[in-house]
């Protein structure tokens, strides 16, 4: 199983949105809520320091993207929530405009992931739940199952073992819906 196509779009979209903003009219208020429109049609409503977004604020783009949360010196950093035009919602930590650290994304189809993010990508330990009732808990690299992990399907199938590039690969224990168990090595 894999995530919907949006899984790789998070980092690309965030970077493409120009979230470290510096153009537009100069804000004069410091630490007070100000509304500022940018050349790309984006609107920021929040606090500024030294003419840059700093503190908390909301940034909206004409395409439906919206970020609400922390800003440091014109960049999205800290805790926040990003809502994407396709209906996906990410809440968690950001660094340099990208998900970084702990975060949760709920995809438009209802599947979700909660766990570690690195450079805007699902990487590290986490839990993914899928619309078919399956759940995976374990390691990820670039949104693919990797390392140790447990996949449980709604029908009772359980794979507990090694993963490589999203595929079962290595030592594992498999419990089938009928209760039979296989322990051994899986290979591509």
Tell where the protein language model's regions lie, with residue ranges.
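Intrinsic low-complexity tandem-repeat regions in disordered proteins
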Residues: 104, 110, 127, 133, ...
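Conserved anchor residues at repeat-unit boundaries in beta-strand-based tandem repeats, strongest
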Residues: 43-54, 66-77, 89-100, 113-122, ...
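Bacterial N-terminal signal peptides that target proteins for export
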Residues: 1-13
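N-terminal segments that cap or nucleate solenoid repeat domains
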Residues: 27-66
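Bacterial N-terminal signal peptides
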Residues: 11-22
């Amino acid at each position: 199983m894999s995530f919907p196509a949006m899984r790789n779009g998070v980092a690309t979209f965030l970077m493409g949105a120009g979230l470290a903003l510096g153009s537009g009219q100069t804000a004069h208020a410091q630490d007070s809520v100000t509304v500022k429109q940018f050349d790309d049609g984006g609107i920021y409503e929040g606090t500024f320091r030294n003419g840059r977004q700093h503190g908390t604020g909301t940034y909206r783009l004409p395409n439906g993207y919206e970020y609400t949360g922390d800003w440091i010196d014109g960049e999205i950093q800290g805790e926040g929530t990003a809502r994407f035009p396709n209906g996906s919602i990410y809440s968690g930590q950001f660094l340099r405009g990208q998900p970084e650290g702990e975060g949760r994304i709920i995809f438009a189809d209802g599947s979700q992931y909660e766990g570690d993010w690195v450079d805007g990508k699902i990487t590290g330990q986490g839990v993914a739940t899928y619309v078919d009732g399956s759940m995976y808990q374990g390691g990820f690299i670039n949104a693919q199952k990797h390392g140790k992990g447990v996949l449980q399907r709604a029908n009772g199938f359980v794979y507990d073992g090694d993963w490589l590039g999203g595929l079962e690969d290595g030592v594992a224990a498999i419990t089938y819906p009928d209760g039979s168990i296989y322990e051994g090595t899986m290979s591509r």
